[in-house]
């Protein structure tokens, strides 16, 4: 038998050597992949940043406001980074296509930002700080998923970054149908989403959660044809044109709660009445409309509440009289719909009011406050919904 050269080894040894070389190549390839992957992971990790938590605390449904169908809701931002972050822009996006459904920057963004406490630099959110963005945009088609992109800068640097979040699908439109809360007119629908201390912006955290009960609240104040709201300088509640007007049930409903006996100031002083938060409503009535919806009538005249809890009322029944109790700048009827029988611990809901026509509008709250004339339009019936901000209306049916 011929000798086998040690150099070549036995057939078994040769096979093992070949396997060893292949195994070595596989290990080398694996090592290259690992090194490459580590580089990729390192690059990706360097791009990850702490920034804003973006939440939509209440999922909206479309609302008819002044003949326009809109989504009215809020973004809650919390800064979880170690840096102060300066807000630059906010976009509401179609979550599927990325198309912008609404954009805010500059002065429009400034006007949409709400902060708790005194914060002169509204766009600058310190570490651990919070901001609320109050949004109103044309309602998208049913089923569209919304997302939001926040562009921000790191304070004191030239770094700018985007972050996306706050995805939701709007609820289907399902406003409760209501009748007029008052008779005749002209009555002014006092509300505007841009007012910094208006109902739309006042958040309450009274039960371990933050709520916005007045999201769609309206303060109704009666005026005359020339825009005045009182027969004198307005210093006496009884001289306001709407004072003592009958307040009407807006639907067939069950009385859910009442409060009466809150005293009324004898004079109307500049600025809102200073009262404890629990007394802000003054005398009030709430009606259970069913389906988890309640309507509130606030600031009623002392001794005027005519109903009691558990009582059934019909649309158009008199339930009280317009007054000047609680936190109020003057005699008016505050009305809103919410998802719980709690004046403050509930979420404000849209509604569809019928039985009114629009006679005109005030061009600004300053014009109204000065008692100047409102702009008269050709009177037009309005489809059920909510009147527009500062619309002047006449209620035409019970």
Located regions from the model:
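Short, solvent-exposed loop/turn segments enriched in Ser/Thr/Gly
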Residues: 57, 67-74
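Zn2+-dependent peptidoglycan hydrolase active-site motif and core
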Residues: 254-301
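Acidic, glycine-rich catalytic/binding loops that coordinate metals and/or anionic ligands
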Residues: 172-192, 198-202, 231, 274-277, ...
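Short histidine-centered loop motifs in beta-beta connectors
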Residues: 248, 289, 293-316
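Intrinsically disordered, low-complexity Pro/Gly/Ser/Thr-rich segments with frequent PxxP/GP/PP motifs
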Residues: 103-141
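Short glycine/threonine/proline-enriched tight-turn/helix- or strand-capping micro-motif at secondary-structure
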Residues: 58, 199-249, 258-278
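A structural signal for short beta-strand/turn segments enriched in small hydrophobics and glycine
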Residues: 253-255, 310-322
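Asparagine-centered strand-capping/turn motif at beta-strand->loop junctions
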Residues: 77-81
């Amino acid at each position: 038998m011929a000798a086998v050269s040690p150099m070549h080894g036995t057939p078994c040894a040769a096979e093992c050597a070949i396997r060893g070389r292949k195994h070595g190549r596989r290990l080398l390839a694996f090592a290259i992949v690992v090194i490459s992957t580590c580089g990729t992971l390192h690059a990706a990790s360097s791009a990850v940043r702490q920034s804003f938590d973006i939440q939509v605390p209440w999922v909206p449904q479309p609302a008819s406001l002044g003949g326009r169908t809109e989504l009215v809701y809020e973004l809650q931002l919390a800064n979880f980074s170690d840096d102060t972050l300066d807000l630059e822009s906010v976009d509401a996006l179609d979550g599927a296509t990325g198309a912008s459904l609404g954009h805010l920057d500059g002065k429009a963004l400034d006007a949409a930002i709400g902060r708790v406490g005194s914060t002169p630099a509204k766009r600058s959110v310190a570490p651990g700080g919070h901001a609320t963005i109050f949004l109103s945009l044309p309602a998208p088609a049913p089923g569209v998923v919304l997302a939001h992109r926040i562009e921000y800068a790191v304070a004191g640097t030239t770094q700018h970054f985007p972050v996306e979040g706050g995805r939701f699908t709007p609820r289907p439109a399902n406003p409760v149908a209501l009748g007029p809360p008052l008779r005749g007119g002209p009555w002014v629908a006092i509300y505007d989403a841009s007012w910094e201390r208006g109902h739309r912006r006042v958040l309450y955290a009274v039960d371990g959660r933050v709520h916005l009960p007045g999201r769609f609240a309206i303060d109704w104040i009666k005026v005359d044809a020339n825009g005045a709201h009182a027969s004198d300088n307005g210093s006496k509640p009884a001289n306001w044109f709407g004072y003592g007007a009958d307040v009407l049930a807006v639907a067939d409903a069950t009385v859910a709660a009442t409060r009466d006996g809150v005293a009324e100031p004898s004079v109307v002083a500049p600025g809102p009445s200073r009262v404890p938060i629990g007394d802000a409503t003054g005398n009030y009535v709430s009606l259970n409309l069913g389906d988890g919806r309640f309507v509130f009538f606030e600031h009623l005249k002392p001794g005027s509440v005519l109903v009691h809890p558990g009582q059934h009322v019909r649309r158009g029944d008199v339930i009280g009289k317009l007054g000047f109790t609680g936190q109020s700048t003057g005699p008016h009827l505050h009305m809103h719909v919410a998802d719980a029988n709690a004046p403050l611990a509930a979420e404000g809901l849209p509604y569809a009011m019928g039985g009114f026509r629009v006679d005109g509008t005030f061009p600004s709250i300053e014009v109204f406050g000065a008692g100047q004339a409102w702009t008269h339009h050709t009177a037009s019936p309005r489809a059920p919904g909510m009147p527009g901000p500062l619309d002047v209306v006449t209620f035409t049916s019970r």
